[in-house]
Curated annotation (Swiss-Prot):
Residues 50-70 form a propeptide. Heterodimer of a B chain and an A chain linked by two disulfide bonds. Pfam families: Insulin (PF00049). This is Bombyxin A-7. It is found in: Secreted. The keyword Secreted applies. Disulfide bonds join C29-C79, C41-C92, C78-C83. It comes from the Eukaryota. GO terms for cellular component: extracellular space. Silk worm has two kinds of PTTH: 4K-PTTH and 22K-PTTH; there are many forms of 4K-PTTH. Brain peptide responsible for activation of prothoracic glands to produce ecdysone in insects. The lineage of its organism: Eukaryota, Metazoa, Ecdysozoa, Arthropoda, Hexapoda.
Length: 92
């Protein structure tokens, strides 16, 4: 009985692992990158950074160094090589 239960458990685990697919990766460049990022961020409920946010840093150019990922990084990660939706969402 224990052997049958162990075999059933192992079969269940093997079937579950085989159905788990890694997240698809694609290359996103230019307008396709901008549109995809805008759509994903909109669906996630993230708004574009406003000018009011820049005011607390003194200059707009200081903001990328203080929080989040810079815009140049997304091209490196998603245009020059494939990236997943999770990586794109990290730039929202």
């Amino acid at each position: 009985m224990k052997l049958l239960l162990a075999i059933a458990l192992m079969l269940t685990i093997v079937m579950w692992v085989s159905t788990q697919q890694p997240q698809a990766v694609h290359t996103y460049c230019g307008r396709h990158l901008a549109r995809t990022l805008a759509d994903l961020c909109w669906e996630a409920g993230v708004d574009k950074r406003s000018d009011a946010q820049y005011a607390s840093y003194g200059s707009a150019w200081l903001m990328p160094y203080s929080e989040g990922r810079g815009k140049r990084g997304i091209v490196d990660e998603c245009c020059l090589r494939p990236c997943s939706v999770d990586v794109l969402l990290s730039y929202c």
